[in-house]
């Protein structure tokens, strides 16, 4: 009977799951479970052909892996016509004190069941069950060899078990490895190893090479960028420079300068209050500094009055202020303008 190879399923897959999967296409005699793959023995080869055609590339398990199902290249142990196939493959490996046991009932088999099955061949030091396989460690290597020859392809709880040497002897910490795990590092295992892209992502060189987004963030948090965000000297001079305030006062209109510079703005006299409340109050008439008596003429009013004067803008000088005589003249000294206008010829005799 030629077994069917089934691979690429999950490591925690159970023998019963594979058996139920292949049972849809014919009677399954047994399933020889390994680490990550298995050999399925079917009673009729035509049923095995149907299973290969239907299940190859079939999604199986929780992760939906695609199974690899095909004929094996050589017959394995358990073949009734050549029952020593598995024994020959085990004897070709380096003998050790630890045996690798598979294809038992992982749901119901306990450590005590394995001890009972292997105790007749020598003193057992340690028994460990890992999911669907187990390790049996003997005290002497000769006892392990005797147990291998006697128990391979034997029945344990109605299951035909497969026994081989472990790749590495168990030590005090129990670090035995299955022989199929070492074979599993062949091309089938390498295909499942991390891709070069992932290795590149985890390498120190990739960590030093920043992405464009990281470079942008680095630029934003750099000290140079922080200094550019600090207040500029220009803004400081605008906020705290007294020259800037004087420039603003210089740019104001003459009316605003008159209002700001006039001491009557802060006057609290009743006359000032009444004048401000008066509807006839002009913003250009300011009180004189003589206790609010009289009005000070603004430059604009003076200019308007000079334009409307019959003397064409010729006004009296401050030095000519005095009492007017009865004929409209002045009692004081004449201004230079009046002297220029006075007739230079002597008065005519009457």
UniProtKB/Swiss-Prot annotation:
Protein's UniProt keywords contain Phosphoprotein: yes
Disruption phenotype: Mutant seedlings show increased sensitivity to salt stress and abscisic acid (ABA).
Tissues where this protein is expressed: Highly expressed in roots and flowers. A presumably longer alternatively spliced form is found in leaves, stems and flowers.
Record has Nucleus as a keyword: yes
UniProt xrefs under SUPFAM superfamilies: RNA-binding domain, RBD
List of residues that carry Phosphoserine: 193, 195, 211, 241, 262, 278, 298, 308, 335, 340
Chain ranges passing through the membrane: none
One GO biological process term: mRNA splicing, via spliceosome
Record domain RRM: where: 2-74, 97-168
Protein keywords: mRNA processing, mRNA splicing, Nucleus, Phosphoprotein, Repeat, RNA-binding, Spliceosome
A Gene Ontology molecular function term of the record: RNA binding
Subunit structure, interactors included: Component of the spliceosome. Interacts with SNRNP35. Interacts with CYP59. Interacts with RCF3 and CPL1. Interacts with DRB1/HYL1 and SE.
Leftover remarks: The splicing pattern of the pre-mRNA is regulated in a tissue-specific manner and by development, and changes in response to various types of abiotic stresses.
Protein name as it appears in the record: Serine/arginine-rich splicing factor RS40
